[in-house]
Amino acid sequence: MKQILDFIPLIIFFALYKMYDIYTATGALIVATAVQLILTYVLYKKVEKMQLITFIMVTVFGGMTIFLHDDNFIKWKVTIVYAVFAAGLIIAQILGRPIIKGMLGKEVTLPDNKWNKINYAWILFFTACSIANLYVAFEMPLDVWVNFKVFGLLGLTFIYTLLTGMYVYKHMPKEKKEEQE
């Protein structure tokens, strides 16, 4: 259910972009992200930091897009969000508190060196997505960027999450694997 909530603003953004324009879609994205945040809190009594960061970025850059009537701001939002996620993972790694381990470490037991590899892999992933978005956003037509944002980045994230899950499963202690099966 929580994952479905995460995709609703993106679906609304895409649909309204196709029906109207980037400005209508951006306004709807701001509203849908706010509603998503409220629903997440009501249903789960907790909001993840990533959701809060995304909401703030959507509101700031989406607001600038609408107010200044310049779609470059919403394009920058995607790049900056991915860069902030990568920077957060880097800082946490330097401080010796890998975020991925904090998110999954209660359910999954892995050696620290495996958690570090996963953390570094996600740093690379978020950095690559940030750079890829820069290229597509500013070198391709708006339609291509919207499709890339909705389907390309979403698809890449889904695949990367699956690959991470496979890596985790491969390195889980044998008794934990048996419990999961």
Curated annotation (Swiss-Prot):
It is a multi-pass membrane protein. It comes from the Bacteria. It is found in: Cell inner membrane. The chain crosses the membrane at residues 22-42, 50-70, 80-100, 118-138, 148-168. GO terms for cellular component: plasma membrane. The keyword Glycoprotein does not apply. Its main location: membrane. The keyword RNA-binding does not apply. It holds the Pfam family IspA. Keywords: Cell inner membrane, Cell membrane, Membrane, Transmembrane, Transmembrane helix. InterPro entries: YciB. PANTHER family: INNER MEMBRANE-SPANNING PROTEIN YCIB, INTRACELLULAR SEPTATION PROTEIN A-RELATED. Plays a role in cell envelope biogenesis, maintenance of cell envelope integrity and membrane homeostasis. Belongs to the YciB family. This is Inner membrane-spanning protein YciB. The gene is yciB.
